[in-house]
Amino acid sequence: MMYRYFAAIAVVFLIVATMVACSAVTASATAIPDPALDAPLATAKGEQHAVLAGGCFWGVEAVFEHVKGVSDVRSGYSGGSPATAQYERVGTGQTGHAESVRITYDPSQISYGQLLKVFFSVAHDPTELNRQGPDTGTQYRSAIFYSNEEQKRIAQAYIEQLNRARVFKRPIVTQVAALQSFNEAEAYHQDYLVNHPDEPYIVINDLPKLENLRKQLPGLYKAK
């Protein structure tokens, strides 16, 4: 993951490759059905949280910041000990952590299942094991960290539904695990796409995800 900070070294090559790469990422998004099992929309405004891991948290964070009903998204680490929740240590792949995002949302505006629809369809590829795109290691694994039994049931049922329908060419490898802790990442990781929209890594890997969200799920998309 550290190489992302030195991506500018390859700018000359990437300028040539960007158009092709972006097209490839855009084409990789998958249209999927709504979850058959989901929580009904709440009758009153409120605040709930979802913690999801889908590769580098920069792009996942940016996607959910553009989802209606979401009020805040923070990048962080989940799955390991709070004592090892530092970027350099997580990057070794030896801490048990996954780069994750904590999504704060209003359950009267969007359901947990609809958040998972965004997660599976445009935020990442749930069939890649311990990697996403150019990033490899267990810290880039696909995971859903549930905070209650309802979230667990919805996540497991949706994965089973999508696998049974063979929506993807390969089986979903997303882990469903109880949330032990969410450890917020360092300040420079927050709103990374907003602060570095022209960085080659962002242009190639993450901006196409926002376009996929806008085109494939227009009813859930919001401009910022």
Describe the predicted segments one by one:
Residues 2-7, 12-224:
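Flexible coil/turn and secondary-structure edge motifs
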